[in-house]
Amino acid sequence: MSESIDINVYSQTTIPNAMAELMDNHNKMEQISAYCKSLYANGDAAQAYEQTQGYAKNALLNVAYHIQTVGTHITSLLQLQTNEMEKLNIEIQTLTQRVRMIHDSTGTNVFSNQDAAKPYKSSLKNRKVDTEATKAPVKYVHKPISYGISASDINQNGVPPPLNHSNSSANLTSSSGHLAASSTSNSSTPSYQSPSYSSQPTISSGTPPPIQKQPPRVGNAPPPPSLSVPAAPPPPVMNVPPPPPTSQRPSSVNNNAPSNDFPPPPPPSSSSSGGDLPPPPSFGLPPPPTLGDDFPPPPPPPVGSYDFPPPPARPQSQFYDHNDFPPPPPPM
């Protein structure tokens, strides 16, 4: 605060007063030079020279003094202004540093460089879609699926084209009349039901089974699919031996006994002591041959059949081998 007051005093009072004294001394030097000229004209020249020389020294000293005083005051004023500028510079730097710290802490440092250089590309942008060649998108039209087949859709061989959902709904830009006709034909198409059938065919004497009528076809609707009834599988064949003929059955069989393939058991023996059992019944088969001593001895083995050593024994492993298990039973 004191320096600011000093600056004001120097700039408003001290320096103007020093300049005024300098100008006053300059005016007095003009008066002294006019007085010295009059001495040379009216008086002694040697005395006038000495007085003029003394006045000139004093005038120069006064001028130098006043110039020095004014210069000193101006230098002091400039020094005060320099000090004040340094203080202002320090305060500005302090405020700038504080603002940067606040921007860094709050994340708003992007606003510090408002005059940042922007990169401009020298080449023009390559437009991928030309605005002149663009067309308006096709408006979506809800079109129901048409299952009808017209005469124009049948080819030369008389085979209708297969139904395809994508083909029937792909043309979205069809006329309104075709849409109305297709919607009318589809709304009147009945829902077909498959005819009921049974796995076992019913056989009636003399009367054929009734023929189920198909529902009438409306418009260009395709015929309903035909259902094929699979044939019933044949019964399995059991491996049961055929019964013996009636001629080989024993005559002791009662006619009132149930008809089966096996003879009845023999009657129990009348003797309680357990005598000889009756012989088994014969079914007309020849008796078995009797074993006797009439068979010839077996032929001797060929010579040299035992020249080879026996095969080595298979090593016993700690783990199971697939050869250790018995062979599987024959199929039934």
From Swiss-Prot:
Could you identify this protein by its name? Abl interactor homolog
Q: Per the UniProt entry, what is one GO biological process?
A: sorocarp development
Which keywords accompany this UniProt record? Cell cycle, Cell division, Coiled coil
Gene (name only): abiA
Kindly state one GO CC term assigned in the UniProt record: SCAR complex
Give the signal peptide, or none: none
GO MF annotations in UniProt:
signaling adaptor activity
Give the record's family classification.
Belongs to the ABI family.
Q: Indicate, by first and last residue, each region the UniProt record lists as having compositional bias (Pro residues).
A: 221-247, 277-314
Coiled coil spans: 73-104
- Function text: Involved in regulation of actin and microtubule organization. Required for proper cytokinesis.
Q: What happens when the gene is disrupted?
A: Cells show no developmental defects, mild motility defects and serious defects in cytokinesis.
